[in-house]
UniProtKB/Swiss-Prot annotation:
Lineage top rank: taxon: Eukaryota
Protein name per its UniProtKB record: Putative uncharacterized protein DDB_G0283469
Biased composition (Low complexity): 8-49, 125-140
Disordered: annotated span: 1-49, 125-147
Length: 147
């Protein structure tokens, strides 16, 4: 018995429609995967940029903090000089002392620098017996100059 034409046509049409739907679904899935990949890449780029920004900000903060330390140090010294203007300590300093200011001795100056930078930059505390202008070759602070 011969199959009527309209049944055959319906069968093929349905198959074609199913295939088309499958293809469309596959395309949609591929597009979704591509979009996800793009989003992941964008997220990674944003993360990297954010990390770089945070690093730059930390570096700037450290610069500002160190500048603040130096300013505080200078203000402290100025206050000390003004307060002790009648004091002659340090008047007989040699040029190698590098602090040609009456009222502030080399030891005072070095102690001030060490104290400030230890406070703001977490440097280890020197031992109480350390002398900053000692001639002892074992002294690690001996070569530090206060410019």
């Amino acid at each position: 018995m011969r199959t009527p034409n309209y049944i055959n046509n319906n069968y093929f049409n349905n198959n074609n429609n199913n295939n088309n739907n499958n293809n469309n679904n596959n395309n949609n899935n591929n597009n979704n995967n591509n979009n996800n990949n793009n989003n992941n890449n964008n997220n990674q780029t944003n993360l990297n940029e954010e990390n770089n920004d945070q690093y730059d900000m930390m570096r700037e903060n450290l610069k500002i903090r160190n500048i603040t330390v130096i300013l505080k140090l200078l203000i402290t010294m100025k206050a000390g000089i003004t307060r002790n203007s009648s004091d002659t300590t340090g008047m007989t300093m040699t040029p190698s002392d590098q602090v040609p200011t009456p009222g502030v001795s080399k030891d005072d100056f070095n102690t001030l620098i060490i104290r400030h930078f230890r406070l703001y930059n977490n440097y280890p505390s020197p031992s109480p017996t350390t002398s900053f202008n000692s001639t002892n070759p074992q002294n690690t602070h001996q070569t530090r100059k206060s410019n």
